[in-house]
């Protein structure tokens, strides 16, 4: 999930508590820079301190090693270094630097091998450049970097919401068998059907990213609410944003139920 405002962060936290599940609040580098690292982290820490479930703050798809070190220093509990567009040995070298720094600070690291097509904030991969993760490359990468989690490309696409992904389950099974305890991560979850989502979890996926669906629904509801006939300059923004937050809450509940084994 993504943190667009403190209001949304509180929505995620409250729903996680109701479902009694841990939660990952995930941001892009752009979001952290827009809000400001310090106020963003302080807001999430305040939510976490009052929460009855575990709360992680994760930096998604970051290509800057220095930015990740800053995130680690200021309080992120998990980061993702994305060197998937680089030659594999350069990706490994850079990931090793991030892992060494992160683990020394008690922070977990997600890496990526194989390019997931599509576009989202900070990530654009042309369809022709996207490729499935090669199991032998994934094993080499994991053995050399010691990442805690690995984003793999098995048929999903960033930003996909008009059609459903075709998951390569044979590849998923092979990756799980080769990589053992390393947590497999599925990006592009919006394009995955409910049945495929549940099967991916059964087959070993430990983290599934869903961003586009949240963004799309939030924008649709906000657009409708802000243009309603009864809106005036005196209308409270809290009241205008409330329906969108409720819609996000519904999606969070739905996805959390799919992710449970």
Please provide the spans of the model-predicted regions:
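C-terminal alpha-helical cap/extension of soluble enzyme domains
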Residues: 193-261
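Active-site cofactor/substrate anionic-group-binding motifs, chiefly glycine-
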Residues: 19-71
């Amino acid at each position: 999930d993504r943190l667009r405002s403190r209001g949304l962060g509180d929505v995620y936290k409250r729903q996680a508590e109701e479902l009694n599940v841990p939660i990952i609040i995930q941001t892009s580098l752009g979001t952290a820079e827009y809000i400001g690292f310090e106020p963003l982290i302080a807001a999430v820490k305040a939510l976490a301190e009052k929460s009855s479930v575990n709360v992680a703050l994760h930096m998604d798809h970051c290509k800057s090693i220095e930015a990740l070190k800053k995130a680690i220093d200021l309080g992120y509990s998990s980061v993702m270094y994305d060197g998937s567009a680089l030659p594999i040995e350069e990706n490994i070298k850079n990931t090793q630097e991030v892992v060494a720094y992160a683990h020394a600070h008690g922070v977990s690291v997600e890496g990526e091998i194989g390019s997931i097509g599509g576009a989202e904030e900070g990530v654009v991969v042309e369809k022709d450049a996207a490729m499935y993760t090669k199991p032998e490359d994934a094993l080499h990468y994991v053995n050399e970097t010691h990442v805690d989690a690995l984003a793999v490309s098995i048929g999903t696409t960033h930003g996909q919401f008009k059609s459903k992904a075709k998951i390569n389950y044979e590849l998923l099974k092979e990756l799980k068998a080769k990589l053992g305890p390393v947590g497999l991560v599925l990006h592009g979850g919006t394009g995955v059907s409910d049945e495929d989502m549940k099967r991916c979890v059964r087959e070993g996926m430990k983290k599934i990213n869903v961003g586009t669906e949240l963004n799309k629904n939030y924008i649709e509801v906000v657009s409708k609410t802000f243009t309603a006939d009864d809106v005036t300059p005196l209308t409270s923004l809290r009241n205008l944003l409330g329906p969108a937050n409720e819609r996000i809450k519904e999606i969070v509940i739905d996805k959390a139920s799919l992710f449970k084994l």
